């Protein structure tokens, strides 16, 4: 919209920057409010001013020069009436910011005026266009009074003393609507300044006289008003202050008009009441400018457009205008707007941290976010500060309520971040605590030195708590209740205690495992020695270095004693190491109870290993062979035909057979009963957990639910296995016996006595030659000494045995090669066939003879063959 060649923002215009250059139409002649008012205030940089702005409205009859006065006084460009026409120019309500006023000397009076003066040009009254329709007149007056600090009444000097000409009808309307407003807002009781500018002032009538005339007329109008209850005795000066100024004729005295306008403009600045100077009412007189703080409607500049629109909406819809309610509604609206704007900046600062935290939680790996605490504090401080800066100007109760709501929104999100940060610190702290303790324990184990597990846990726990508190303090936001992290710290400490206890139990489990391995090693060596002694039936083999061979009957006594001693030593080691873990008595008791059960399992597994069929049969055979092949002195026997092989064989076999029932049951020789395993292990400790029992092997006679008795637990070889061992051992023993018998029979052949005489006669010359030759004699002497030493060492038997074995092997090899040679030729095959025929014819006689000479040897042949097979296995 263009007025006087200048651009204005009209209602409904499509706007760009130049439309706001000289002002804006607030309300058009059709009573439509301009929604672009806020854009104009932003364009003029008034919005950030807060309360540092002033609003002036001008009233007066149509075509009396109101717009001209404003343009001259404030440098605005409101539309003015053409000098060639007499018609309405200002339609509706217009608003423009003061543009400054240049003096003739080039000085800028803007430096003397207050900042951000908004000038509102109101449509003139008593115009022919509206005639008797005073609705817009009343509504515009109410709007101006509700929003403006200063109401300029533009009248001519010759109109003073008139009713309509002096706008007394309009002022009566102003007073009436003012009473309505004040009735709604008795607490604040806002005041306004009625500034009468008397145009075409000649000076003939003093300004003071004109002032008195106007005040008398105003008081008369005020007294004639029908006042609400409680305001019957109120005075006009309770609600209004008055100021007066005269201006010369613009056309007849242009230079003087300009000078007076410049002087008048200097009054539009901030003023104050001087309590030392009182006016007729008894209040302090106004000093300085005309803008007093009590005139200001206390509507921040950024909310003025919304406030004005709300006021006009109430007015145009003929609703009772309630300024406090409008101020509250404005405060709610603006506080919500400011809150949203503040939250945008808050989102930019906090959303990245929320996204990172949510992503880490979704990935199952919460992370401690660096810089979160400072970001939270800065974001909250800036948000609240920015809100306070913008919103604290509005209604205090609404401002406080909206501030609390904003803080709740901010704190809700910050609390979630805070708790997420503590949760991540909790989880990472627990993990680092576990890893640190484990690493320290491994380092102590690698050094080979003893380490104090309790001290390690105490040290790492202290470091973990310090780190958690450091993270928590770094994330704390001051002046917030939710920043108290003592509950989370207490929970963290409890979890550290739980994890520390779990690590201690795990370490005790590992200690128990190491002790168990130590027990297994010691038991393995000791039990091997005891069972190896069973495999030797001769003195010296399984006997100690000094003393006699231990009795086979006391085998289980020795095993039990060794077992008890080793486990007691292990318990001592376990208790000593457990003391460095700061373990409780209950935990030590559970550990010892588990150690005893595990140790019995190790012993039983070792015994079962020794009792395997192959192992026990081998030991029985070795025991029998030692008793059969060696004499009581441990010397190997050389079987001769006159030896009582049958008796020796029977004694050795029966002695070895007694081991099978002995080994079949774990019994102590003194009591002939199983050892007190149930009492030795003891009852299950009351502090034992299911986890302590889940990896334990049930033990008969100890665990009631196992269904096995102690006698069954101590049975090492079942009846079926005993019988099988007996049969197989006898077969093995029979084979050894047959071998011995063959050896004795093979030595029956003797050299005839005449052979020695023949040897002496035929070898006499050689004997004499040897005796006469020193070399031969020396060789003979050495051979004789060697034979004597061999005899003294009782080595002739083994030498002969080895010689016979070598000769037998050579004979067998010769026979094999001869057979291969014969099979390779036709003549050899014919000779072998003839030899086999003769052997078949004489088989019966030879077999009969063998039966007679061996005394029933043929009846035992099958047993001998089976024994040979077992011996080969």
Curated annotation (Swiss-Prot):
Which SUPFAM superfamilies does the protein's record reference?
Answer: P-loop containing nucleoside triphosphate hydrolases
Q: Name one GO molecular function term.
A: GTPase activity
Q: Where is the composition biased (Acidic residues)?
A: 691-701
User: Which Gene3D superfamilies does this UniProt record tie to the protein?
Assistant: P-loop containing nucleotide triphosphate hydrolases
Q: What are the transmembrane regions?
A: 751-771, 775-795
Which residues does the record give as GTP binding sites?
A: 60-67
Name the major location.
endoplasmic reticulum
Q: Where in the cell is it found?
A: Endoplasmic reticulum membrane
EC class (word): hydrolase
Region (Disordered) location: 677-701, 841-873
Q: What is its EC number?
A: 3.6.5.-
PROSITE patterns registered for this protein in UniProt: G_GB1_RHD3 (PS51715)
Which keywords does UniProt give here?
Answer: Endoplasmic reticulum, GTP-binding, Hydrolase, Membrane, Nucleotide-binding, Transmembrane, Transmembrane helix
Give me the Cytoplasmic side stretches, as residue ranges. 1-750, 796-873
> Which ranges does the record list as Lumenal topological domains?
772-774
Can the keyword Cell inner membrane be found in this entry's annotation?
no
> Domain named GB1/RHD3-type G: which ranges?
50-308
User: Which family is it part of?
Assistant: Belongs to the TRAFAC class dynamin-like GTPase superfamily. GB1/RHD3 GTPase family. RHD3 subfamily.
Chain's role: Cooperates with the reticulon proteins and tubule-shaping DP1 family proteins to generate and maintain the structure of the tubular endoplasmic reticulum network. Has GTPase activity, which is required for its function in ER organization.
**Protein name as annotated:** Protein SEY1
């Amino acid at each position: 919209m263009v007025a006087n060649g200048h651009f204005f923002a009209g209602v409904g215009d499509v706007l760009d920057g130049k439309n706001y250059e000289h002002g804006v139409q607030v309300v058009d002649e059709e009573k439509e409010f301009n929604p672009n008012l806020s854009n104009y205030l932003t364009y003029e940089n008034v919005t950030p001013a807060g309360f540092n702005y002033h609003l002036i409205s001008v009233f007066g009859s149509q075509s009396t020069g109101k717009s001209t006065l404003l343009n001259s006084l404030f440098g605005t460009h409101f539309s003015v009436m053409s000098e060639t026409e007499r018609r309405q120019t200002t339609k509706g309500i217009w608003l423009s910011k003061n543009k400054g006023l240049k003096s003739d000397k080039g000085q800028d009076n803007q430096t003397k005026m207050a900042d951000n003066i908004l000038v509102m040009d109101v449509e003139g009254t008593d115009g022919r266009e509206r005639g008797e329709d005073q609705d817009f007149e009343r509504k515009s007056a109410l709007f101006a009074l509700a929003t403006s600090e200063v109401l300029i009444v533009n009248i001519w000097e010759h109109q003073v003393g008139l009713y309509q000409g002096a706008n007394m009808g309009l002022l009566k309307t102003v007073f009436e609507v003012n009473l309505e407003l004040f009735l709604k807002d008795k607490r604040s009781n806002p005041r306004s300044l009625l500034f009468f500018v008397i145009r075409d002032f000649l000076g003939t009538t003093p300004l003071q006289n004109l002032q008195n005339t106007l005040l008398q007329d105003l008081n008369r109008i005020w007294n004639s008003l029908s006042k609400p209850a409680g305001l019957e005795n109120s005075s006009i000066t309770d609600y209004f202050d008055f100021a007066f100024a005269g201006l010369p004729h613009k056309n007849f005295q242009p230079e003087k008009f300009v000078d007076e306008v410049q002087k008048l403009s200097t009054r539009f600045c901030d003023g104050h009441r001087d309590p030392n100077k009182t006016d007729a009412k008894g209040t302090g007189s106004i000093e300085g400018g005309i803008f007093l703080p009590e005139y200001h409607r206390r509507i921040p500049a950024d909310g003025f457009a919304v406030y004005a629109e709300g006021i006009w909406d109430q007015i145009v819809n003929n609703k009772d205008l309630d300024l406090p309610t409008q101020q509250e509604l404005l405060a709610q609206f603006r506080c919500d707007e400011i809150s949203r704007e503040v939250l945008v900046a808050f989102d930019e600062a906090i959303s990245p941290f929320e996204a990172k935290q949510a992503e880490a939680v979704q990935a199952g790996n919460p992370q401690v976010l660096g810089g979160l605490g400072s970001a939270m504090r800065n974001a909250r401080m800036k948000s609240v500060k920015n809100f306070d800066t913008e919103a604290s100007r509005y209604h205090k109760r609404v401002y406080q309520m909206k501030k609390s709501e904003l803080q709740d929104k901010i704190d809700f999100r910050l609390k979630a971040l805070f708790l997420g940060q503590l949760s991540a610190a909790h989880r990472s702290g627990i993990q680092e605590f576990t890893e640190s303790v484990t690493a320290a324990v491994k380092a102590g184990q690698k050094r080979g030195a003893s380490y104090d597990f309790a001290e390690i846990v105490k040290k790492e726990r202290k470091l973990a708590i310090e780190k958690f508190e450091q993270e928590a303090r770094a994330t704390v936001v001051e002046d917030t209740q939710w920043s108290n992290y003592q509950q989370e710290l207490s929970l963290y400490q409890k979890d550290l205690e739980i994890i520390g206890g779990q690590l201690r139990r795990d370490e005790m489990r590992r200690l128990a495992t190491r002790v168990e391995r130590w027990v297994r090693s010691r038991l393995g060596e000791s039990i091997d020695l005891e069972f190896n002694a069973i495999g030797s039936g001769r003195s010296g083999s399984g006997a100690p270095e000094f003393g006699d061979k231990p009795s086979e009957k006391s085998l289980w006594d020795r095993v039990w004693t060794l077992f008890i001693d080793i486990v007691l030593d292990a318990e001592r080691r376990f208790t000593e190491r457990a003391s460095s873990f700061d373990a409780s008595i209950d935990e030590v008791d559970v550990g010892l109870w588990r150690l005893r059960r595990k140790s019995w399992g190790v012993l039983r597994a070792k015994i079962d290993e020794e009792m395997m069929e192959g192992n026990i049969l081998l030991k029985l055979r070795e025991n029998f062979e030692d008793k059969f092949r060696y004499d009581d002195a441990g010397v190997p026997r050389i079987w001769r035909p006159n030896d009582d092989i049958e008796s020796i064989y029977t004694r050795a076999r029966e002695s070895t057979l007694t081991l099978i029932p002995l080994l079949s049951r774990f019994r102590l020789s003194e009591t002939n009963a199983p050892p007190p395993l149930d009492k030795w292990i003891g009852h299950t400790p009351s502090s034992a957990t299911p986890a302590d029992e889940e990896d334990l092997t049930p033990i008969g006679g100890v665990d009631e639910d196992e269904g096995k008795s102690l006698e069954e637990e101590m049975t090492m070889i079942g009846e079926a296995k005993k019988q099988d061992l007996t049969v197989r051992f006898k077969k093995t023993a029979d084979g050894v016996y047959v071998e011995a018998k063959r050896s004795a029979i093979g030595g029956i052949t003797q050299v005839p006595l005449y052979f020695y005489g023949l040897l002496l006669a035929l070898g006499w010359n050689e004997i004499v030659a040897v005796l006469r030759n020193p070399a031969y004699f020396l060789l003979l002497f050495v051979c004789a000494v060697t034979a004597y030493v061999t005899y003294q060492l009782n080595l002739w038997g083994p030498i002969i045995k080895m010689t016979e074995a070598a000769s037998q092997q050579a004979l067998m090899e010769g026979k094999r090669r001869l057979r291969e040679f014969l099979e390779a030729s036709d003549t050899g095959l014919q000779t072998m066939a003839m030899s086999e025929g003769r052997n078949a014819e004489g088989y019966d006689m030879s077999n009969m003879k063998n039966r007679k000479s061996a005394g029933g040897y043929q009846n035992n042949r099958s047993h001998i063959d089976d024994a040979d097979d077992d011996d080969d296995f």
